[in-house]
């Protein structure tokens, strides 16, 4: 059975609806980034799906199309804030910030995952990046935005290979931490126990 990726958008036809997804919950370094997208249902961009199912080249192409045609915004929470409030709270904060940063205020906000929000406009959808075009578009914006941020940080700290691993705990990244120690961008709450 084919999944209708516009199912949730069709469910709320008379509301301004935004989709939100995040990138960067699991890495050892860098921020968590959430993106919010309001899709124009009269202008559906072909090929939008969960960013994890797309090649880097395709993600970049879709990023350009989404940002040119849809209302979108990001919310970025730093590694230091993640260490202060924990990754779950930081992710929620990034999602709320992304919604607040939209130039048009959404009446319904679909969020990928199972996080609980006090704001009743926020509806969490498990596997949402496969079930909602708005969330899938947001997953692309979040992923590309975060990858670009990590590329910038990699220019400053090339030894950690963030341009390749985006801050995730790959074997090479772990080896670099052992060899060079932690950078100012590492999440201490993620790395302290591993790399004293």
UniProtKB/Swiss-Prot annotation:
Keywords: Cytoplasm, Endonuclease, Hydrolase, Manganese, Metal-binding, Nuclease
Name of the coding gene: rnhB
UniProt xrefs under HAMAP family: RNase_HII_B
Annotated PROSITE patterns: RNASE_H_2
Listed cofactors: Mn(2+); Mg(2+)
Name of one Pfam family that matches: RNase_HII
Record protein name field: Ribonuclease HII
Catalytic reaction(s) noted: Endonucleolytic cleavage to 5'-phosphomonoester
GO biological process: DNA replication, removal of RNA primer; mismatch repair
All residue ranges annotated as the RNase H type-2 domain in the record: 15-196
